[in-house]
């Protein structure tokens, strides 16, 4: 008995969506006049490709390694050396909560790994551009693997002899970010990087498409251990605030944030979930109690308005601030900095000799009041913040009070730090979590991206014959790698912001991506 499907014009819905998926373009089912219903074969009567998915020899555990990085576990059913079916994690008890093991079921990207493996568009044999043709003409001829290896090796030797090892660069955007051996991130941790280190090194990169600023800024505020509470701890939160975090679009799988948020909503229904985001995201629609729209890149001003309100109203724990913060009060700089023992070379407030470099008039207290170095900027009241952020002053006060009625978890996505002031945005979001006493407690967190629990696994770094040190001294921003190809001769300290290691051993990092650094 066939199933009935509504058709649109002369194309059935099934065919229409199949065509859209095949062409890789987004389409909308609007403006199509429905035609008469037609009989369409049932899904279970369609011919299977690659053999019977229930007839297999072995089952092997694998993982989805696309660029979201969630690494959802997958089971591969194999028959005669061919994958006949991909299945999700359905083993064990599915218990969500702190210390519990829950099933990490992949999204559609993981479930379609078999189609990816056997895609007719996948290049499975070496191809060489036809002699005499130009790049972009798309004319290739098949060659053997031995020919390909010899051609690549010969070309690499010629490049090294003429230009040196800094003419080699490893681009990380390969589409297999999460692989264990085939991983592409971080380039320094890949097998190819180890090979290049054996052969003299390569041009390195710093920063990345995702976390160019937050990666450097969070350790300056929270120290080296800045990871957030594990996501399952959200069942202990009274309030959950998401800044620029939309996992319904970015991390929707069973081992990622969106599924976990839905579980938190089910198990902790009394929790108030607030989404601070310029647009009404799918996450805000799906799980939030409240959406607070904000002008992009103004998170720092929002937090300043919140803290000024709490501070002026006497709602903050002053002793906590004096004990745990450096630079909030103008009268506590010297003692705080002298008592601090930097755990890394990237410590704000110290010069080459270890002396204090921050002027007392630049305290956060002075910034909030508009005094000292900030004279003339005005007091950072909720009304001031409202004019910058577009968030009403009363809403700013309500959000601030929410933090004092904790425990309140703060989780920021990577959108707030993708601005010219992104470093300050990311630190400000972490600051509102810390200054309200929500760090280091169950149901709270550091204000970074959601924390995850994981199991360590062996990596190529454990292989003793592969040296980890890259002897090439130049490191270029991954944003600027194209310039190193087109005209590396103009990349100097004046035009591309070169930084060099100084006599104290402290490496100077630019806050914003897009500069060149010598190390």
Language model feature labels by segment:
Residues 377, 383, 399, 403-519:
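A glycine-rich, hydrophobic/aromatic-adjacent loop/helix-cap motif
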Residues 57-58, 169-171, 397-398, 444-449:
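Beta-strand segments within the central parallel beta-sheet cores of soluble alpha/beta enzyme folds
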Residues 138-148, 154, 389-405, 409:
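Structured, non-membrane catalytic/scaffold regions adjacent to prosthetic-group chemistry
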Residues 267, 272, 279-405:
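Long, well-ordered, tryptophan-enriched scaffold segments
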Residues 200, 389-390, 437:
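Glycine-centered helix-boundary capping/hinge motifs
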Residues 85, 204-205, 316-321, 395-396, ...:
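Acidic/polar loop patches that form or flank catalytic/metal-binding clefts of enzymes
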Residues 2-316, 324, 328-332, 336, ...:
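N-terminal export/assembly segments and adjacent metallocofactor-ligating motifs
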Residues 193, 300, 304, 397, ...:
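Non-catalytic, well-ordered alpha-helical scaffold segments
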